Amino acid sequence: MWSFLLPDARRRRDRALGLAGVLRSALLVQDIARNGAQPGDLLQTCIRSVLALDSKDSLRALGDIDSLRHSLALLCPLLQRGPGNAREAELLRYSMALTTLGKRLLKNASATRRVQEGVEQAQRQIAHFADPMQRSIVAGLAQTYTEAIGILRPRIIVSGESRFLSDPDDAARIRTLLLSGIRAAVLWRQAGGRLPATILERRALCQEAEELLATHPQLTR
């Protein structure tokens, strides 16, 4: 499940992409929980990243640079100076929890099997409906998160407005996005990502993020 080997030359780039993918999910979760936002195309990109079981390319698995632009731009400030306000502190909390859960998922065979079963079921549904945003597909992936990731620790407590957190559709979107964040965390870990090393190589990761943004200017929204 979600497993492939990466050439050494791509490992640092893929670590930057993986962290940006984690942060993208955290940003979208926060926006739904606080504002009831409807992420639309970004949610669809995140769903497709969950379904990319055998992609050999991290960027293709995560979507494209445009979908990661905001998180790539935010990655450097968070790595270099830490969170500058309560919103960024919350994003960092979500992101660190997602990276930890990615590690623990890979070590838990039953949770890994449950994720694979849920992803394969969603793939079959998409083959029928052709739309990854179909309500039943989002609900199914959310259920996969609950059943597979809910047994792991730490538990992610999402903060926000109760009217959004209690809405079944918003709650399903949030859980699906958390699953996509764990998928990005798995990519990061497969590229050699480790939290202590991230602090030591933060300057190099920032350089990778800046180069990715600079080489894809045409994708700006």
UniProtKB/Swiss-Prot annotation:
Gene3D superfamilies registered for this protein in UniProt: HflD-like
UniProt superkingdom: Bacteria
Places the protein is found: Cytoplasm; Cell inner membrane
Presence of the UniProt keyword Kinase in the record: no
Record-linked SUPFAM superfamilies: YcfC-like
Pfam families (alphabetical): DUF489
Disulfide bridges in this chain: none
InterPro entries referenced in this protein's UniProt entry, alphabetically: HflD, HflD-like_sf
Keywords carried by this UniProt record: Cell inner membrane, Cell membrane, Cytoplasm, Membrane
GO cellular component, one term: cytoplasm
Membrane-protein topology: Peripheral membrane protein
Membrane-traversing stretches: none
Family to which this protein belongs: Belongs to the HflD family.
Protein name, UniProt field: High frequency lysogenization protein HflD homolog
Native species: Acidithiobacillus ferrooxidans (strain ATCC 23270 / DSM 14882 / CIP 104768 / NCIMB 8455)
Lineage: Bacteria, Pseudomonadati, Pseudomonadota, Acidithiobacillia, Acidithiobacillales
Encoding gene per record: hflD
